[in-house]
Amino acid sequence: MTRRFTMTPNSRNPVKTPVSGMKVAPFPRHSIATEEVRRRDMRVVREKGYRQQCVDGILRFLVENGYDGQVSQKILHNPSSKDFQSIFKFLYGFVDDFTFSSRFEDEVVNVMKNLKYPYCGEITKSQLSAITPHTWPVILSMCSWLVDLISHGTSLLQQEEERSVESCFFEYVCDGYMRFMEGDEDDTALEEEFERRVTEIYTGIFKEIDRKKEELRRIEEMISEARKMSEGREELDRKKRELTDDLNMLIASEKQLEGKKRKYLGAISRLSEEIVKVEEEIESLRAQEDGLRAQITKQRINPEDVKEMNAEKIELFKELERMKPEKESLMKVVGEQEREAQERAEEVEKLFFDLKGLRDEISLRIVKDGKGVPRVANEVSGEVFSGMSGVIVRLEEELNSKSDVLVTAEMNKSILEEARGEKESITSELNSRLGYYSDKLVMAGKLYLEKKEISENEQRKSKTEMELLENELLKLNLESNTSLLMSEQKLQKARIVLDRTLNSINYEREEINKMIFGFYNAAMDIHASIQSQVGDLRALLNK
């Protein structure tokens, strides 16, 4: 039965196990508690070198034994009250399974007194309740002393375990010798007791060796099964690696495309705005076109009518050209007749003037006889000139005929002028309509040219954008190929690291096998030496 190494009573709580997984390693107290003797502390606890030594020892012990709290050089140089309580409870767990209550400061002082800490008089409750840089060196020295105590107790237990076989053997020899001196030569029970004690000592070791062998065999079986499974999974692993590489490449490409995506989205937004503006302009032009179309549809004249009117215009022009010679000839005739009539009128006026002058002297006047025939007679003398009356009548008749011809020519002239005016008005109207339709055709041609230019500009822009996108696609292809090469290089490096790891694992397994085999051989050698010594003792006893 394991002995307890403190004066504190046994606790009914279950055995406390530290974080490292080791069981509580109690060790015996080889002294009886007496009254505390206050002694002077010869240590320089506030010296920087001594404090660093204590911190290093505590930190190494906590790390080696699996302390699960936060620990570092900085924390151990200036800890909080919570850090100190956690560290002290962990350290004291290697001594006893005592559970601390809310009166932590009182219990720490009591347990340190029970452990016979030589400088326990310097530890006070106020120092333990509020850890300050001034009081911490004393408490740090106490924790370092507790770590040294635990390490010393552990080494003593190990030494006792190492000496247990030799002590059993010497006890067996002494007991056999004492019984031999007393005359009891029956050492069967003594040998059985010795074998039982030695078996108890090595049973745990042999069980641990068997357990390690079984575990090693199980691990080898698992490795062989894993290898068998890995042979069938190589293809899946290869596909997995390929998919992983593709995924990594896609992720890298996606990261690279994010910036370009934002840039293209901005360009698309700008193009969308421009497209909206162009569409608005197109809508306005369409509205104008619809208005023009509506205006054209409302008109009665269509392009065929324009062609007919143009043909009619040409015919009219031709007719005018044909009428020009007739007009000129008529104008010449009219001019000649007017000139002739003017000359006749001038002659008649001259004659009348002459006659008037003569009439003043002669006093001639035209009279009619009883038959109504006009005759020229002198008023003064009453003389009748029968010859002159015929000439005068003939001249008057000729004058009247010429006057009639002149009136007829004037009428023809007015008719021709009216016809010419009508033709000119029709021609001007046709010219105005022709100009209107020409303007409409020019406007439609300009609109067509503008639309054509807009469409050509859009095609050029689209072509430029397509070329830019093709260039970006080529760049992405090159980048993806580069990423693929880099991924393959990383895969090769990972394979090399995996091979090295497998080699190191195989090497460690071989070393473990060698150590187990050496330990097994050493145990067998010890067992053989013990058997030989037992045989020698039996031979001595038989003598």
UniProtKB/Swiss-Prot annotation:
Keyword Cell cycle among record annotations: yes
Keywords noted in UniProt: Cell cycle, Cell division, Centromere, Chromosome, Coiled coil, Kinetochore, Mitosis, Nucleus
Subcellular location: Nucleus; Chromosome, Centromere, Kinetochore
GO MF annotations in UniProt: microtubule binding
Main location: nucleus
Keyword Nucleotide-binding: no
Coiled-coil intervals: 203-356, 450-483
Residue spans of biased composition, Polar residues class: 1-14
Region (Disordered): 1-20
Top-level division of the source organism's lineage: Eukaryota
GO BP field: cell division; mitotic sister chromatid biorientation
Intrachain S-S bonds: none
Any single GO CC term annotated in Swiss-Prot or TrEMBL for this entry: nucleus
InterPro entries the record matches: Kinetochore_Ndc80, Ndc80_CH, Ndc80_sf
Subunit: Component of the NDC80 complex, which consists of at least NDC80 and NUF2.
Function comment: Acts as a component of the essential kinetochore-associated NDC80 complex, which is required for chromosome segregation and spindle checkpoint activity.
Family as reported in the entry's similarity comment: Belongs to the NDC80/HEC1 family.
Protein name: Probable kinetochore protein NDC80
Organism, as annotated: Encephalitozoon cuniculi (strain GB-M1) (Microsporidian parasite)
Gene: NDC80
